[in-house]
């Protein structure tokens, strides 16, 4: 009768749950972290270490967090936690962007615009309350992601101290000579009723009209003479322009040509029966004439654009307005006609070239910019013959103007085209350039552009292409419009002279005095401030500016208002945001940092891509492909979301779908099961009593510690360069290959069958202990909840949190001068694979049921055989096979053969051994098992 030897085996035992059950366990951990003040404890534990400051770019305090928020915050959290483990003190102060239009719009929907139900002060208070509510909602979800930080003391741009520090920061920018004021064309949103910064613009397709308009020459003979041609009597000459913005024609003050472009004087279609010749860029003449219905290109003369400089044309419908031909570098012969209608109030290049020619002094502000902030023509806008423009919105005016031009004969061609056009990022509506009085941070006045380009070169950019991208943006960007004509924001706290419009000569001193008051009472102080308090008798000569600062200035100065204010080093070690922030926060921070201190405010800058579905499509409600982080946490847990983010290539678009989440859940189970197996086999192990020194370990145990050391070197280096996908891949590979397919499988025999305190068993447990200690740290930045859970189950003293620890220092490489090196083990593992290939067909044809039923013969060259023969008694444990014989052969290759064993099977260890039944007390056991149960136990050196 078979005895039950199960009680003599040391099978795995642990209370560490097989199932993560993360949606239930994670909230309980969060409550404990909150109760114990985990962030404060981690900071206190790290006191005195070198600082690593990842400065948080503030999300906007409006609406629930979405998947992009989760990606951003979790990437930051992974870095912060990895820095604690790397021996740094890594403070993380989350922040929120609280001023600006989206919040104003939310309040307007409820209470109407300022002056309807609320005055400006009441309106600002409602904005403040709304933003505070939104912060609380977002903070709850950010914490649920497992992100640690100073959540009780975040920075908020609406805090009085922040607002005051922002005014002080602006004063510093002014002191350094970067502020300017002017009437310039700026991006303008008619729905916002305000200027927009570059970062507030996004491009979308728009269908626009295209028109070719003839500008008749005042003196046709003079134009012809420039081409070396004499005109016949009655022949007209005109310069056609091509535009997609007919609404700007009332503001047309010149036509620009390219000085070095080649132009031709060609025959066009007759105008009211009279011949009309046209001036067109030579490269475009054929295409243009085809649009006008003229088949043949009849050229009468050639000239450079420079030959036509300052010749006069007539406006196509304001006949009394002289339109000079001028020369501009922005003109090309890529498309159109090579002649560009120039409206300085509605284009930056138009403005610059008109300024060079002195055109701005010849016209009134209403002629330069005839539209108001709503996009409607001013009452003073002259009509087009009988067509009234005053009061008409520009988007409706296009067709009206085209019809009027058709009636006058000035319209040569009209069509429509779809093209990429700037839109307001908030309203998703088309915007326009509009010349208005604004405050700017000049890119040239105090060399800001050049200094910023130099500063970019001092920063480490991840990915590296980020450097060229932001440099190109800085190189080509216009002055920064920092003024906004809105209510909810930080005021540009300047006094300007009523007659000259110049800021007070003591402006920055006065701003700092205003900041003291704002720090006590918030921005409302500015609007209630009696100027006489600061200006005394001068008060009657000055007006307070009512414009507020661009919200990108709010967030752009956080290196001063947050880092410096809280005693943290500047520049920060790292800024990390989405790739759209090269034109947003990275850029506004760079410009303010350089404007204030001549240096970039960050040492490293890292960008991540946007989230898309498995087909590469942007996630949206309309497509039904959106996945919210709240849903993932509710169904799978935050650690699964964190694992996906870490495993994705965040430098590009990040794909997510239910199938991808399922794959990550499977990967999580593999990691968790590995941890559970390690813990199960560490049952009864006390590192203080049972730890076997590395040099005394069984060879395979020493090798797995060596492999763990190699992996830790790679993992810590990958964390340092923010390559989290390599970490996840390395972990999964280690769990599947090194541990799952090899080490854990091979060591089961020792762990289960040897005496509890046998050196071979304690050696395996010691190796597993080292691996587990390292493993919990490796996963902690990514799988924060699971690492915390695992930490509590590890043998030995593990109080507090894994983040109190640093990278595990119990690992070491195998000595290069050891009797058997890691290279020797690698050769034996290759032999193990060779054995498996030999056994596979034997299993398939039924010759054996399991590898333990096969006896192996290895034939190798004499030197290799001599090296392996001392191991041959234990090779069966490495191969998990029957007995192994190593023989020398005259060959350079290694040959493996196998045959089914005829030996009896031990019911306890399942090995087939000749010694089974040799002890009458245990007729079904091999001698090894008998010794392990009752005797001194077996010894292992190798496997």
From Swiss-Prot:
The gene is ileS. PANTHER family: ISOLEUCINE--TRNA LIGASE, MITOCHONDRIAL, SOLEUCYL-TRNA SYNTHETASE. L-isoleucyl-5'-AMP binds at residue 577. Zn(2+) binds at residues 906, 909, 926, 929. This is Isoleucine--tRNA ligase. The lineage of its organism: Bacteria, Pseudomonadati, Pseudomonadota, Gammaproteobacteria, Lysobacterales. GO terms for cellular component: cytosol. It is found in: Cytoplasm. A motif ('KMSKS' region) lies at residues 618-622. A motif ('HIGH' region) lies at residues 59-69. Catalyzes the attachment of isoleucine to tRNA(Ile). As IleRS can inadvertently accommodate and process structurally similar amino acids such as valine, to avoid such errors it has two additional distinct tRNA(Ile)-dependent editing activities. One activity is designated as 'pretransfer' editing and involves the hydrolysis of activated Val-AMP. The other activity is designated 'posttransfer' editing and involves deacylation of mischarged Val-tRNA(Ile). HAMAP family: Ile_tRNA_synth_type1.
């Amino acid at each position: 009768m078979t005895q039950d030897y199960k009680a003599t085996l040391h099978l795995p035992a642990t209370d560490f749950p097989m199932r993560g059950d993360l949606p239930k366990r994670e909230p309980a951990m969060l409550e404990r972290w909150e109760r114990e003040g985990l962030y404060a404890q981690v900071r206190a534990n790290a006191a005195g270490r070198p600082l690593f400051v990842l400065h948080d770019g503030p999300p906007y305090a409006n609406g629930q967090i979405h998947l992009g928020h989760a990606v951003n915050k979790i990437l930051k959290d992974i870095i912060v936690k990895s820095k604690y483990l790397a021996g740094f003190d890594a403070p993380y102060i989350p922040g929120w962007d609280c001023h600006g239009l989206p919040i104003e719009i939310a309040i307007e929907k409820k209470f109407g615009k300022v002056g309807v139900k609320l005055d400006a002060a009441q309106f600002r208070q409602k904005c403040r309350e709304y933003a505070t509510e939104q912060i609380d909602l977002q903070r709850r979800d950010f914490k649920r992601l497992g992100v640690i930080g100073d959540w009780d003391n975040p920075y908020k741009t609406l805090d009085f101290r922040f607002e005051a520090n922002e005014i002080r920061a602006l004063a510093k920018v002014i002191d350094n000579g970067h502020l300017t004021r002017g009437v310039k064309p700026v991006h303008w949103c008619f729905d916002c009723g305000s200027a927009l910064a570059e970062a507030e613009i996004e491009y979308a397709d728009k269908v626009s009209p295209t028109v070719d308009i003839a500008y008749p020459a005042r003196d046709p003979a003079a134009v012809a003479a420039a081409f070396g041609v004499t005109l016949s009597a009655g022949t007209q000459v005109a310069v056609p322009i091509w535009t997609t913005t007919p609404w700007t024609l009332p503001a047309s003050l010149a036509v620009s040509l390219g000085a070095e472009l080649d132009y031709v004087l060609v025959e066009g279609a007759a105008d009211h029966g009279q011949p009309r010749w046209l001036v067109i860029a030579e490269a475009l003449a054929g295409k243009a004439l085809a649009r006008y219905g003229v088949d043949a290109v009849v050229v009468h003369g050639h000239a450079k654009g420079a030959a036509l400089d300052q010749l006069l044309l007539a406006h196509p419908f304001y006949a009394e307005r002289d339109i000079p031909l001028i020369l501009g570098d922005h003109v090309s012969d890529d498309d159109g006609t090579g002649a560009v209608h120039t409206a300085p109030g509605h284009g930056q290049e138009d403005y610059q070239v008109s300024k060079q020619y002195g055109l701005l002094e010849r016209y009134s502000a209403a002629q330069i910019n005839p539209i108001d902030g709503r996009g409607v023509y001013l009452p003073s806008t002259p009509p087009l013959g009988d067509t009234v423009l005053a009061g008409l919105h520009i988007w409706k005016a296009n067709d009206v103007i085209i019809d009027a031009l058709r009636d006058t004969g000035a319209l040569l061609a009209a069509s429509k085209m779809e093209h990429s056009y700037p839109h307001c990022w908030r309203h998703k509506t088309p915007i326009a350039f509009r010349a208005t009085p604004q405050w700017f941070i000049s890119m040239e006045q105090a060399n800001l552009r050049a200094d910023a380009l130099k500063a970019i070169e001092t920063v480490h950019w991840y990915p590296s292409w980020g450097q060229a991208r932001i440099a190109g943006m800085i190189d080509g960007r216009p002055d920064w419009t920092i003024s906004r004509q809105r209510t909810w924001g930080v005021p540009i706290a300047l006094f300007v002279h009523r007659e000259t419009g110049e800021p007070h000569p003591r402006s920055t001193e006065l701003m700092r005095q205003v900041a003291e008051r704002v720090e006590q009472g918030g921005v409302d102080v500015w609007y209630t401030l009696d100027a006489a308090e600061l200006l005394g008798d001068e008060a009657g000569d000055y007006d307070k500016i009512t414009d507020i600062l661009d919200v990108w200035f709010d967030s752009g100065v956080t290196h001063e208002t947050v880092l410096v204010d809280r005693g943290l080093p500047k520049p920060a070690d790292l800024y990390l945001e989405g790739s759209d922030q090269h034109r947003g926060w990275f850029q506004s921070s760079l410009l303010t940092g350089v404007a204030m201190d001549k240096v970039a405010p960050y040492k490293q800058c890292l960008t991540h891509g946007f989230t898309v579905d498995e087909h590469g499509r942007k996630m949206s409600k309309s497509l039904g492909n959106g996945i919210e982080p709240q849903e993932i946490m509710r169904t799978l847990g935050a650690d699964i979301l964190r694992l996906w983010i870490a495993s994705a290539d965040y430098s590009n678009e990040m794909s997510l779908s239910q199938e991808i989440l399922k794959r990550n859940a499977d990967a999580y189970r593999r990691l968790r099961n590995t941890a559970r197996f390690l813990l199960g086999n560490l049952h009864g192990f006390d590192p203080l009593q049972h730890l076997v020194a590395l040099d005394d370990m069984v060879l395979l145990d020493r090798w797995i510690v060596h492999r763990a050391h190699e992996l830790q070197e790679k993992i810590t280096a990958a964390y340092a360069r923010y390559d989290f996908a390599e970490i996840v891949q390395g972990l999964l590979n280690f769990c599947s290959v090194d541990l799952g397919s090899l080490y854990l499988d091979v060591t089961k025999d020792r762990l289960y069958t040897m005496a509890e305190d046998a050196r071979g068993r304690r050696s395996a447990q010691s190796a597993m202990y080292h691996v587990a200690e390292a493993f919990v740290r490796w996963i902690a930045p990514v799988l924060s909840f699971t690492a915390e859970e695992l930490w509590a189950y590890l043998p030995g003293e593990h109080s507090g949190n894994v983040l109190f620890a640093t990278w595990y220092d119990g690992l070491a490489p195998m000595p290069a001068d050891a009797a058997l090196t890691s290279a020797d083990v690698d050769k034996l593992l290759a032999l193990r694979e060779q054995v498996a290939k030999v056994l596979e067909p034997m299993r398939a044809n039924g010759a054996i049921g399991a590898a333990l039923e096969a006896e192996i013969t290895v034939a190798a060259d004499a030197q290799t055989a001599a090296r392996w023969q001392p191991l041959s008694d234990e090779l069966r444990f490495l191969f998990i096979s029957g007995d192994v014989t190593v023989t020398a052969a005259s060959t350079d290759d290694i040959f493996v053969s196998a045959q089914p064993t005829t030996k009896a099977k031990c019911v306890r260890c399942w090995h087939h051994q000749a010694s089974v039944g040799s002890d009458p007390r245990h007729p079904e056991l091999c001698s090894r098992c008998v010794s392990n149960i009752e005797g001194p136990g077996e010894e292992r050196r190798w496997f």
